[in-house]
Amino acid sequence: MKLHKKIAAVMLCAALLFATACGTAPAQEQSATPDSSTPTIRFLLRGTASGMDRVLDALYAQMDDDHRWQLDFTFVDSGDYAQQLARSLTAHDNYDFVFDAPWQSLAMQTEQKNYKNLKNYFNNPEYPALQAAFSEEYLAANTISGGLYAIPFTNTYYDVPGIFYRKDLLQTLGLPFDEITNRAEMEQYWAAVRKKGEMKPISLGSRGFYQYNLPEITLRQNGIWVSQGWSFWDYPSQILLSSDGKQVLDVVFPGDSNEHFAALPERYQTNFLDVYLQQNAADSQWLSPDDLLQENGARVFLLGQSASYEASLASGTGQVQQQLRTIVPEGEVAFWAYDDAFLPQNRAQGSIPTTYAAWNDLCVPSYSTNTIEAMRFLDWLYSDWSRIDLFNYGVEGTDWQVVGDEEYTLLQPMGESFRFPSYELAWNPQHHRIDTALPDAEKALLEFTFDQSSYAASPLAGFTLNTTPIAIEIAGLNSLYAEYYTAFGHGAYGAQTQEKIDELHTRSEAIGLETVRAEIIRQIQTHLDKNSAE
């Protein structure tokens, strides 16, 4: 079989070993055992990877004559991935699996019939490992119009967002605390870093402050939800449900009038979406102008050039710290979850409302002629959790070591360290490990999110917005908001923020905002009525 390397034009389309190239750049081959009869499974994924040669060697060593494939990965830098995916699907590029997500283009691509319905491959005894790893309930929560057009990947039903920060740096700043536990302490830390003048207080990526000023789980606990099927980041909106979950009270947008909110029940009368964008503007004092151009705030942090960055917890601070120490040997990384719903005293059974929908997926292009072979590979991959561990942690004994039944420790391999966007292939609610070196508080937070009893089903579970009746309006709104997205997310409008919110709302009304509002309300109420009747 052949292994190939692909290098992206922008950053690093892959730090990998596989064939072809981003766009039309020539491929660079690397040695491997050639076998032209071996089926090839081709992936188009988002992000970067390293240390994959040894991972694939270990994976190939487990294959036999009846289960043998050559894997070919194309990695595209996160900032360019959405456009590359659209181009590849339009051009019918030869991929068997492509990454997509509800927050990216999953609903749109599905409605355009660009993905295959994979329902027959799951809950199917001919694919026993997939049947075991993907429960019927989990799949049901991830269907679109009754079909399974995306294979859902999540290691937990909520990945906690927060701020990764330099704990070693904090301890040199003379502040009266040695860890960050609230917003006031975080701002004191940023202020002290700025005063010292050696690095940026925080580096943000393309998603800006993300949920820092709009804590999602706290909102859910108060009956406020985003719509599955139309990403909040394509155009911000929130669904307001009654306290019993049986009625949709409204769908609200930035720029809705104060009178609009005043007509709602008391707990919804704050124009919280405007407040969210205004708070982003207030917090922009901590940013540098070039943050608007950064795709990933972690890169600046890992180079030792910023004191913090915003991201979701994923597997914890361990791998982040390992990468930082290649540049900053004394670096120590900690994490603060900025949603108060995750304070230790607020954690309880059923305290995380969820739809059980995954936020990352693999899809099979509708034109693929290799689907059976691709699904055979996926079934084989999931037939042994040790294979999944390869894509989560690297090679055991080189990159990591088992500790007990559910923990692991990271090792320092010779050469490049392992890195792979495992959320695109190897996350599953049934299989977890926790880095044994993590602080006890961080372990406890991960254990809480891994525990399925921490979750409670939302009345919106199983609902996905059918955008077909409002496709023209939503396309127009998405295109319009793209003009504002980066500046709103980073607070770059400053004192002009409210003016820009009002401008967005006026322009949105002209291209169908009220039509969209009415249709979302209608569809959700139909869903809630169906729930009540069952």
Task: Give residue ranges: language-model regions.
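Extracytoplasmic/secretory soluble proteins
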Residues: 2-3, 12, 16-534
